Regions:
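Long, compositionally biased intrinsically disordered regions
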Residues: 112, 125, 129-195
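Divalent metal-dependent catalytic cores for phosphoryl transfer on phosphate-bearing substrates
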Residues: 1-127, 131, 140-144
Length: 195
């Protein structure tokens, strides 16, 4: 739990560059996609420097260093590729330094961090949109090999996905859609039909 609380301390160096701290002006606007990616990526090394200065234990530093693994700053990477489809891309400018997570706990944090961040960009919070988001984010991490150094099994990953989906539904208060009454005034899903 402590690792989860401290994993993003590096954002304190340049807080305005992270969406959760922005209101109004976006400081990324005048920058290139590569510059923006480098600023965002630097929060990992900035966090490790802070952790060293504060003499935090190695277990906490492991959460800081691995919570993006060797993943990409996807927003800026995808934006660059979409804007400049004919230009070669220097992937190193969009890639976190790693290492990839190597314990169950650091792997779970990586998944939780990515899912939580992506969930804030959903246009609507329905059971379907939340489920699709969680599956898309975590399946992408698995496909990119970001979790291969952890002891997490496929069954573990499926359990984690289901837990995240339920938690996000609770956070965003998704509701079940209630059935309509049919023309004769009876509910199609009434208890009478079930008995």
């Amino acid at each position: 739990r402590t690792g989860a609380l401290y994993h993003d301390i590096g954002k304190l160096k340049n807080p305005a560059f992270f969406t959760e701290n922005q209101s109004g002006f976006n400081p990324h606007t005048p920058l290139s996609f590569e510059q923006s990616a480098q600023i965002v990526i630097s929060h990992v090394n900035d966090g490790l420097k802070m952790a060293d200065k504060l003499r935090l234990p190695q277990a906490i530093k492991d959460f800081i260093s691995t919570h993006h693994g060797h993943g990409k700053a996807k927003f800026f990477y995808n934006s660059f590729c979409n804007k400049y489809p004919d230009q070669p891309v220097d992937e190193s400018k969009f890639t976190y330094p790693g290492p990839n997570p190597f314990t169950k706990e650091t792997g779970i944090l990586m998944m939780a961090d990515a899912v939580e961040a992506a969930s804030r960009s959903l246009k609507e919070y329905t059971n379907e949109s939340i489920s699709q988001l969680v599956n898309r984010i975590i399946d992408s991490q698995v496909a990119d090999g970001l979790l291969r150094d952890t002891p997490l099994s496929f069954r573990d990953v499926e359990t984690i996905k289901a837990t995240f989906i339920e938690k996000l539904k609770t956070i965003y208060h998704t509701r079940i859609s209630y059935p309509e009454l049919n023309k004769n005034g009876k509910n199609d899903n009434s208890d009478e039909k079930r008995q």
